[in-house]
Amino acid sequence: MDAPGAPAPAAAPSSARKELKIVIVGDGGCGKTSLLMVYCQGSFPEHYAPSVFEKYTASVTVGNKEVTLNLYDTAGQEDYDRLRPLSYQNTHLVLICYDVMNPTSYDNVLIKWFPEVTHFCRGIPTVLIGCKTDLRKDKEQLRKLRAAQLEPITYTQGLNACEQMRGALYLECSAKFRENVEDVFREAAKVALSALKKAQRQKKHRICLLL
């Protein structure tokens, strides 16, 4: 314990390791858990098991800085709509995921997920992720979609949804084939760090104005 009147500990240098909290949301079965497991554990789950709430930790290098990512997987099912907001506290960024082969999960980006995130995480940046891109070439999946008079969601449609929700970035990935998986989290970390710097500059500016 510091003695009375002792000087406060020096502030951590700017090169200190950063920690970011990132929450991942999206419809149940859209691919968000597989994305997290491949990135953090290197393994793709062959069988779908609904998540409730799980935390994963990983490290990423942004520029010359090591950043710790605390990644929170959430339940997309309606049964958890009242519990899920507990995950949003003190988050730095939200990844909104959808399945490019499931038009309903795409529609829910703007119908459900964006409004929910905006309500509970006002001012927090979002990144939109199109998952399961490998299935765009899967003949059986295409047959099922077309039998229902539906088509896979295109990259352009994903980009349009991102623009409508004023997302910071739109990315696509295939967890099964590890395509763009690392890019998703590296770019998400960049967006979150940039938002933090901007908030700190604004805070300093307000302090200067008050003085």
Curated annotation (Swiss-Prot):
Q: How does it sit in the membrane?
A: Lipid-anchor
What positions belong to the pro-peptide in this record?
Answer: 209-211
- Amino-acid positions noted as binding GTP in the UniProt annotation, renumbered to this chain: 26-33, 73-77, 131-134
Q: Where are residues bearing Cysteine methyl ester located in the sequence?
A: C208
What are the BP-aspect GO terms? actin filament organization; small GTPase-mediated signal transduction
The keyword Cell membrane belongs to this UniProt entry's keyword annotation: yes
What GO CC annotations are associated with the protein? cytoplasm; cytoskeleton; plasma membrane
Q: Which Pfam families match?
A: Ras
Motif Effector region per UniProt: ranges: 48-56
Q: Which residues cross the membrane?
A: none
Read off the InterPro entries from this record.
P-loop_NTPase (IPR027417), Small_GTP-bd (IPR005225), Small_GTPase (IPR001806), Small_GTPase_Rho (IPR003578)
N-acetylmethionine PTM positions: M1
Molecular functions (GO terms): GTP binding; GTPase activity
Localization, UniProt:
Cell membrane; Cytoplasm, Cytoskeleton
Q: Which UniProt keywords apply?
A: Acetylation, Cell membrane, Cytoplasm, Cytoskeleton, GTP-binding, Lipoprotein, Membrane, Methylation, Nucleotide-binding, Prenylation
**Disulfide bond sites:** none
Q: What is its main location?
A: membrane
Give the SUPFAM superfamilies listed for this entry.
P-loop containing nucleoside triphosphate hydrolases
Among PROSITE patterns, the record links this protein to:
RHO
Name the residues where the record annotates lipidation as S-geranylgeranyl cysteine: C208
Could you tell me which NCBIfam families the record lists for this protein?
A: small_GTP (TIGR00231)
Described by its record, this protein's role is as follows: Plasma membrane-associated small GTPase which cycles between an active GTP-bound and an inactive GDP-bound state. Causes the formation of thin, actin-rich surface projections called filopodia. Functions cooperatively with CDC42 and Rac to generate additional structures, increasing the diversity of actin-based morphology.
Q: Which family does it belong to?
A: Belongs to the small GTPase superfamily. Rho family.
Protein's recorded name: Rho-related GTP-binding protein RhoF
Its source organism is Mus musculus (Mouse)
